[in-house]
Amino acid sequence: MRMANRIGAGRKSALQLSHLRTRLTSSAAAVATAPTLDPAPVPAPAAAPREWLVLFPDMPNVLDRRLEIRPRHSPNFVRLHKEQWVTWAGPIFEKHTFPGNPRRPFKGSVMVVNDVSKEQIWERLKSDPYIQERIWDLDNARVIPFVTNMRRTPKK
């Protein structure tokens, strides 16, 4: 009797397994043939401004003109700083000199700006007097991807 129960149980299991396979196969076919919903295209997020290190060497022999044009250049950079487009900026020198020296040995400018691309940076800077008056050497200027990791004000 036990043997008969085992055989009957085996047939029952086989029937259950066969039924389960049929259900799974028909369910898979239904999923495969079900109409798909095309989600609306997701627009790419707008490019976030990033930091860029901008190095502008001066053209040769422009110190007198640089000093003459500086009163028009400086307010432009104050405005760009207030708009938070320029994080920090300043002149580059041949060597350190005493504070207030009217003939400091300028050799260019450096700045960190926040924008989405080099092209946007050039577009924004092209109206600066140092570019229009050819103080900065654009052929040797560099715009480099940059990240400020630490920022600390030096103690005086």
UniProtKB/Swiss-Prot annotation:
Q: Which UniProt keywords apply?
A: Signal
Q: What induces it?
A: Expression is positively regulated by the aspercryptin cluser-specific transcription factor atnN.
Q: What is this protein called?
A: Aspercryptin biosynthesis cluster protein B
Q: Where is the signal peptide?
A: 1-39
Q: Which InterPro entries match?
A: Dimeric_a/b-barrel, Sec-metab_biosynth-assoc
Task: Report the gene knockout effect.
Answer: Decreases the production of aspercryptin by more than 80% but increases the titer of aspercryptin with Ile replaced by Val more than six-fold.
Q: Write the gene name.
A: atnB
Q: What does this protein do?
A: Part of the gene cluster that mediates the biosynthesis of aspercryptins, linear lipopeptides built from six amino acids including 2 highly unusual and nonproteogenic amino acids, 2-amino-octanoic acid (2aoa) and 2-amino-dodecanol (2adol). The core structure of aspercryptins is as follows: Ser/Ala-Thr-Ile/Val-2aoa-Aasn-2adol. The first step of aspercryptin biosynthesis is the generation of the fatty acid precursors, octanoic and dodecanoic acids, by the FAS subunits atnF and atnM. The fatty acid precursors are likely transformed into the corresponding alpha-amino fatty acids in three steps.
Residues forming coiled coils: none
Task: Say which family it is in.
Answer: Belongs to the YciI family.
